[in-house]
C-alpha cells in the first residue's frame, strides 16, 4: 500500500497543534493540542477519529519543551494504532508563518531551506522560531520522512509590486526586507477556492474578497485564484482591527509614544500587538461577550464594534476598487463563521456595490459553505469555513506525491 497519511504540525511558541489525515478520502484520523509547554500546568488534549472507537483523552503535568511535546503527541497517536513509524505515513507538513519572497510554494525542507527560514526570523520574531523548533524536532523523530513547509506568506507572493511595496526609500526597504508580505495565506487560498466551488465556477473565473476574521484578522483581494492585495503587511499588525492588535495606525503614533510617554520600542510593540484592537477599546476580545455587552447598553462595547465594522467596510470598498469586478465576499474563521451580527453590519449599506445579506440565511448555523445573500444581489455573500490543516495536508501530499505544488515555484 502506498503511503497516504499526512501529519500536520502547527508549532507555536508554547504550543503544538497536530492533525493526522488520510489523504485517500481527506478524513481526520486524530487531532490534538499540547499547550503551555514549559510550564507546570502543561496540557495535552487528544481527539481520535469519531468513528474509531477511542475516546478523547487528556493528560496534564509539565511538558518541558517542544521535543517532549511532539513525543507525547506521537505516543497518543501510537495508542490509537497511528504511530509515526507507520509505513502509511507519507510526510509531515509544517505551518511556517513567514517564507519571505523566496518561497512561493510548499517546499520540501532541506538544510538549506531551514537556514533560509532561520534568516527570516528578524521579520517574524514571534512565529518563525517556534516553527523552526517544530521542524527540527520532527526531523529528529523521523529523519527518513519528507518534511514539507507550507508558508502563510506564499499565497500573497503574487501581489503586484504596487500593492506589496511601501512608499519609503527603496534602498532602505530592500536592505531590511521591508515590504508587505501578508499572512493567513493558507486560509485565504483554501477559502477563495471553496468559494468558487460554491458558485459552481472555476477559481480562475472568480474574483473574491476573503475576510478571515478570528482573533487575528485579515482581508484579501483574490482575482482568478491569485492574491492581488491583502491587509496584513510586513507583520500581522497591519490592516483590520483585531482582537488585541490595532491594525492600521498612523506610524507617527509610535514616535509620539516614545517622545511624549517615554515608551520603549518593546513597550510600544506590546501595546499595539497585545493591548490594542477590541481588547484595548473595550477590555474584551470575544465577539460574543462584546455583543452581549452591547445588548445590555454598554457604550464602550458598542463603540469598539462600530470601529471594527468601519474598518471592515473600508477594506471591502477598497478591494472592490482593486478588483474592479467582485463575484463574492466570503466570511471565514471564528468570528467570520459564527458572528452573524458582524456579517450583517459589514455588508449593511453596500447595496450600491451589489452586496446584501438575507437575515434568515445569515441566521442559519452550519459547518458547510453557504450563501447568505438574497437571490437579487449582484455579489454573492458567503460563509465558508476555513480548514488550514486540510490545505496544508493537500499541499504537502501534492508535493510529495510528485503532483507539483498548487501555486508558484521556489525562486532561487
Swiss-Prot record:
Active-site residue list: 152
The reaction(s) this protein catalyses: acetate + ATP = acetyl phosphate + ADP
Free-text function comment from the UniProt entry: Catalyzes the formation of acetyl phosphate from acetate and ATP. Can also catalyze the reverse reaction.
Record keywords: ATP-binding, Cytoplasm, Kinase, Magnesium, Metal-binding, Nucleotide-binding, Transferase
Cofactor, free-text remark: Mg(2+). Can also accept Mn(2+).
Source organism of the structure: Streptomyces griseus subsp. griseus (strain JCM 4626 / CBS 651.72 / NBRC 13350 / KCC S-0626 / ISP 5235)
Annotated binding of ATP, by residue: 17, 212-216, 286-288, 334-338
Family the entry assigns: Belongs to the acetokinase family.
UniProt cofactor(s): Mg(2+); Mn(2+)
The keyword Transferase is assigned to this record: yes
Any GO MF annotation of the entry: ATP binding
Gene this protein is translated from: ackA
A matching Pfam family: Acetate_kinase
One biological process term in Gene Ontology: acetate metabolic process
InterPro entries, alphabetized: Ac/propionate_kinase, Aliphatic_acid_kin_short-chain, Aliphatic_acid_kinase_CS, ATPase_NBD
Subcellular location: Cytoplasm
GO cellular component, one term: cytoplasm
HAMAP family: Acetate_kinase
Name listed for the protein in its UniProt record: Acetate kinase
Binding site for substrate: 95
Residues flagged as site, Transition state stabilizer: 184, 245
Residues the entry annotates as binding Mg(2+): 10, 388
Keyword Ribosomal protein on entry: no
Region Disordered, residue ranges: 40-61
Complexes and interactors: Homodimer.
Pathway: Metabolic intermediate biosynthesis; acetyl-CoA biosynthesis; acetyl-CoA from acetate: step 1/2
